[in-house]
């Protein structure tokens, strides 16, 4: 088996492949270009997209050149895959802003020093905006049958549930297939990689290229990654685990990995770090907390840099072991004048965005789960006063794992 495909499987990236044996032979013979598409409906990606990013890195490691497709055109429509309702359509300016920011995030992960493997960034709006509808139906639409389109899960599930599916969304799969055709023509792209929910769209592209130009290309999908708890990768009780520091601090990102369930640690070391698979096997019986710190450091270094990862580890040590205020601990600010309004502990927790549910805060208070400077607060009417702030700072804690600094300004 080809080395890229072997490592792809060994790391747990593999789900399905079209023409696997032929793809393996192709990868043995030559270096290829492969693409992964990214939705641009939000300003940032979250860790739910991280497996696809790791696929891009693995392509580079094995000497192949990744193409990053940013869906400036298809975002104007919305991918119905895995959705039970029509997405909100964004404005042109919002989409452009999202594209620029997502490209910056992806560049943190990818090496651009080697011209042979340097990522190629493309925006499918470049070719989709000028499509002539009549020509498109004649040249591309004729290769699709309604019978087959209705068989794909993204369509079938919505219809079975009697949920509306717009004609606009129904056409999404044709446009994604057309993206592959364009990249095959313009960039000699031979492979599309995507999540398992994209299988139907990817197969459409492979078939379209075969019918349109008689070229043989391939599709490769990754599994849906879930946490041991059964939750989707990318979401926590506190919200999405964003890859942009504007939305999630490097410390909170580090903590996400540090607090992974014990059952997920070895799997995630293989998927979300570059550590050699054999090395991971050799350390699998090491102390689980040391392995979690290793995972947190490697994952954070990849996105935010090694220095930032070290600072996060030191902050965690100061916060948990030394019960002090770590330098990298997330900080929220409140104005001194606000104290005149008799802010309670309940108000402070909400202002700090550690928790938004008053009933949940009350439950935590009853269980001694909320602390200021290490001291449990047992009264929900406890007032926040200036004398609590040492050097204008307090440490506010929810449970054992959520900590922030509150600065008085």
Curated annotation (Swiss-Prot):
Organism encoding this protein: Pelagibacter ubique (strain HTCC1062)
GO molecular function, one term: RNA binding
Cellular component, GO annotation: cytosol
E.C. numbers: 6.1.1.1
UniProt keyword Ligase present: yes
Keyword list, A-Z: Aminoacyl-tRNA synthetase, ATP-binding, Cytoplasm, Ligase, Nucleotide-binding, Protein biosynthesis, RNA-binding
InterPro entries (UniProt xref): aa-tRNA-synth_Ic, Rossmann-like_a/b/a_fold, S4_RNA-bd_sf, SYY-like_C, Tyr-tRNA-ligase, Tyr-tRNA-ligase_bac-type, Tyr-tRNA-ligase_bac_1
Gene name per UniProt: tyrS
Motif 'HIGH' region, residue range(s) on this chain: 40-49
Enzyme class: ligase
Gene3D superfamilies: HUPs (3.40.50.620), RNA-binding S4 domain (3.10.290.10), Tyrosyl-Transfer RNA Synthetase (1.10.240.10)
Protein name as catalogued: Tyrosine--tRNA ligase
Subcellular locations according to the entry: Cytoplasm
BP GO terms, sorted: tyrosyl-tRNA aminoacylation
Subunit text: Homodimer.
Protein task: Catalyzes the attachment of tyrosine to tRNA(Tyr) in a two-step reaction: tyrosine is first activated by ATP to form Tyr-AMP and then transferred to the acceptor end of tRNA(Tyr).
Motif 'KMSKS' region, residue range(s) on this chain: 232-236
Binding-site residues for ATP, renumbered to this chain: 235
């Amino acid at each position: 088996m080809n080395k890229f495909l072997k490592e792809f499987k060994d790391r747990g990236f593999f789900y399905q492949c079209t023409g696997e044996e032929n793809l393996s032979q192709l990868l043995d013979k030559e270096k290829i270009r492969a693409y992964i598409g990214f939705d641009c409906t939000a300003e940032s990606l979250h860790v739910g997209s991280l497996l696809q990013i790791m696929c891009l890195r693995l392509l580079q490691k094995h000497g192949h050149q990744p193409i990053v497709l940013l869906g400036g055109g298809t975002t104007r429509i919305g991918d119905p895959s895995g959705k039970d309702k029509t997405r909100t359509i964004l404005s042109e300016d919002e989409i452009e802003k999202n594209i620029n920011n997502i490209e910056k995030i992806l560049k943190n992960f990818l090496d651009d020093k080697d011209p042979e493997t340097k990522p190629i960034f493309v925006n499918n709006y470049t070719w989709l905006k000028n499509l002539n509808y009549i020509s498109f139906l004649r040249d591309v639409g004729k290769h699709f049958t309604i019978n087959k389109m209705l068989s794909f899960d993204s369509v079938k599930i919505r219809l079975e549930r009697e949920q509306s599916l717009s004609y606009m969304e129904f056409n999404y799969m044709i446009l994604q297939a057309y993206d592959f055709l364009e990249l095959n023509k313009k960039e000699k792209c031979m492979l599309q990689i995507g999540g398992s929910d994209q299988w139907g769209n990817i197969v459409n592209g492979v078939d379209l290229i075969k019918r349109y130009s008689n070229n043989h290309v391939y599709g490769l999908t990754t599994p849906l990654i879930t946490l041991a708890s059964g939750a989707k990768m990318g979401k926590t009780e506190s919200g999405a685990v964003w890859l942009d520091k504007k939305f999630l601090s490097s410390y909170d990102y580090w903590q996400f990995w540090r607090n992974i369930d014990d059952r997920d640690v070895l799997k995630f070391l293989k998927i979300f770090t570059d550590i050699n698979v054999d090395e991971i096997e050799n350390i699998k019986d090491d102390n689980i907390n040391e392995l979690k710190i290793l995972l947190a450091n490697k994952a954070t270094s990849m996105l935010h840099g090694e220095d930032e990862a070290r600072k996060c580890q030191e902050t965690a040590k100061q916060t948990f072991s030394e019960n002090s205020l770590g330098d990298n601990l997330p900080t929220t600010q409140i104005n001194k004048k606000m104290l005149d309004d008799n802010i309670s502990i309940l108000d402070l927790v909400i202002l700090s965005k550690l928790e938004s549910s008053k009933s949940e805060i009350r439950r935590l208070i009853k269980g001694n789960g909320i602390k200021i400077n290490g001291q449990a607060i047992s009264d929900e009417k406890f007032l926040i006063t200036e004398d609590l702030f040492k050097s204008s700072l307090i440490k506010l804690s929810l449970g054992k794992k959520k900590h922030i600094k509150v600065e008085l300004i």
